Regions:
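Structural detector for helix-capping/boundary residues
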Residues: 89-91, 140
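A short, internal acetyl-CoA/4′-phosphopantetheine-binding micro-motif in the GNAT/acyltransferase core
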Residues: 91-98
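Acetyl-CoA-dependent GNAT
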Residues: 4-83, 89, 107, 113, ...
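Short coil/turn motifs at secondary-structure junctions
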Residues: 76-78, 96, 129-131
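Short coil/turn segments at alpha/beta junctions that flank glycine-rich nucleotide-binding fingerprints
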Residues: 84, 100, 117-120
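Conserved acetyl-CoA-binding loop-helix of GNAT-fold acetyltransferases
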Residues: 99-112, 135-139
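Conserved acyl-CoA
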Residues: 94, 105-121
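C-terminal "cap" of GNAT-fold acetyltransferases
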Residues: 3-10, 23, 118-161
Length: 161
């Protein structure tokens, strides 16, 4: 595999911002996510919205010069542990680059940063029918519980640190 690099996005860097919009739009185009992509107003408001949130962490994955993966995370607190927690809000890898360990590497970096901040856990949500993502999360040590939502069953998963 080409050299994989995981790094924190700089929300003032135009290349990073374009990659964030591109990867999240590609993710939204997936049939499991509705298949329609992000609306123009969402695409234009995405970066300003991320910049306004002090609790956001955006990690990008690059292979050589191409940015091919993203993890959008939100810092929070576990009230039951009285410690920080980190939620993976979005995790996506460009379709042509899947199956190459990029998602695993992004999750490992999320976990490393969570441990560094003393987090009690990393959490995420995944659609029950998204078997590829569920398999990845299970391999990475996440365990889940299901709940019904209008769009189907969503699993809330956590990895305790």
């Amino acid at each position: 595999m080409s050299e994989l690099n995981i790094f924190q996005a700089e929300l003032e860097n135009n290349e990073h911002c374009e990659a964030i919009r591109r990867l999240l739009n590609e993710y939204a185009l997936e049939p499991l996510e509705g298949g329609t992509g992000l609306a123009p107003e969402v695409l234009s408001g995405l970066i300003p919205g991320l910049r306004e949130q002090s609790s956001v962490l955006v990690l990008l994955a690059s292979l050589e010069a191409d940015i091919v993966g993203i993890a959008v995370c939100l810092w929070g607190v576990s009230t039951f542990a009285a410690r920080p927690a980190l939620n993976i809000h979005d995790l996506a890898v460009s379709g042509a680059c899947r199956g190459r360990g990029i998602g695993t590497a992004l999750i490992a970096e999320v976990e490393r940063r969570a441990r560094e901040k003393g987090c009690s856990r990393v959490t995420l949500e995944v659609r029950a029918e998204n078997s590829n993502a569920r398999s990845l999360y299970t391999r990475c040590g996440f365990e889940g519980a299901a709940h019904e939502v209008p769009a189907g069953v969503t699993l809330f998963c956590a990895k305790y640190l």
